[in-house]
């Protein structure tokens, strides 16, 4: 398993500063704006990452908030334009060497049928394949993908040609047991967003020897998972930025003692 952080955890710190100031083995890049897709900027990020020995596993688009409007619209021309727009992401990913594109999808109240959703996802999935990119559906609570039943239907409809990002805090918010999710979808999970929790907060830094993190990692081991697991936290919930890197350290230690 590969462990790292999401640069989103330190938002709004500039991404290049996160990479330059903190040596981590792996990371997920959160693109925050249009100019960060410019080849000159992306090459700069790649150089900084290489100098720090950082492998970029995945990227997360700032347009995830617009995916319902762009990709799951009733206006076909907007959908086609949105598909073309994603080429900018995939070209940037090719420069970075990132292989996994994190996808949220439509909101729960989306206007399209489930089958239409699956077919549109497949268009983006197939475009990603042309660039050597895996478009991976994340289980986001506020989206249709927050439902395991929906994901199961999606996998069946697309004949198993679906990759998933598993986010354990999103599972908590949806009332879904993390262990049950892993057991159900293990063959399709290619990437993980991970955080800890308390009775009072569903997204906290990873505590030393956290029982729930140890259980999750043990289950992932049993299922043969070998992909990435990146710490994804919300900066406004942190007492200090160092909590992100302490979480990574605690995550690695939890894996080693399992």
Regions found by a protein language model. Give the residues of each.
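N-terminal pre-domain/capping segments
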Residues: 1-90, 94, 129, 163, ...
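Hydrophobic faces of well-ordered beta-strands that scaffold small-molecule active sites
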Residues: 3-7, 27-29, 56-61, 101-103, ...
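Acidic-and-aromatic substrate-binding clefts and catalytic sites of carbohydrate-active enzymes
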Residues: 6-14, 30-44, 108-115, 142-147, ...
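A structural motif
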Residues: 24, 93, 97-98, 189, ...
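Acidic/histidine-rich catalytic cores of soluble enzymes
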Residues: 26-27, 123-210
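Charged helix-capping and loop-helix junction motifs
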Residues: 40-44, 79, 83, 114-122, ...
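Active-site acidic/histidine proton-transfer and metal-coordination neighborhood
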Residues: 68-163, 243
